[in-house]
Amino acid sequence: MPVKFGKVLIPQPRSKFVKIRCPDCGNEQVTFSHAAMVVRCLVCGRVLAQPTGGKAKFAGHIVKILE
């Protein structure tokens, strides 16, 4: 009988890095999906991510989710 290989039970993290575009100036910036501090745009200073206790609430447009 051949040996059957099951699923490898290695937990994967749910948090990722995301690239956000600022709605005011168009600057693209990389931040953490579960940010614990307020993330501001480096060019104009607008708040891009607000911490909520879990995932951050994003004010800008999410351009790409980085792996």
Curated annotation (Swiss-Prot):
Q: Name one GO biological process term.
A: translation
* Keyword Zinc-finger in record: yes
The entry describes its oligomerization and partners as: Part of the 30S ribosomal subunit.
UniProt binding sites for Zn(2+): C22, C25, C41, C44
Q: Which UniProt keywords apply?
A: Metal-binding, Ribonucleoprotein, Ribosomal protein, Zinc, Zinc-finger
Q: Which organism is it from?
A: Pyrobaculum arsenaticum (strain DSM 13514 / JCM 11321 / PZ6)
Q: Name one GO molecular function term.
A: zinc ion binding
Give Gene Ontology CC terms.
Answer: ribonucleoprotein complex; ribosome
Gene3D superfamilies in alphabetical order: Zn-binding ribosomal proteins
Quote the NCBIfam families the UniProt record gives. PRK00415.1
Q: Does the keyword Ribonucleoprotein apply?
A: yes
**Chain ranges of zinc fingers (C4-type):** 22-44
**What is the cofactor note?**
Binds 1 zinc ion per subunit.
Recorded protein name is Small ribosomal subunit protein eS27
Q: Which domain of life is it from?
A: Archaea
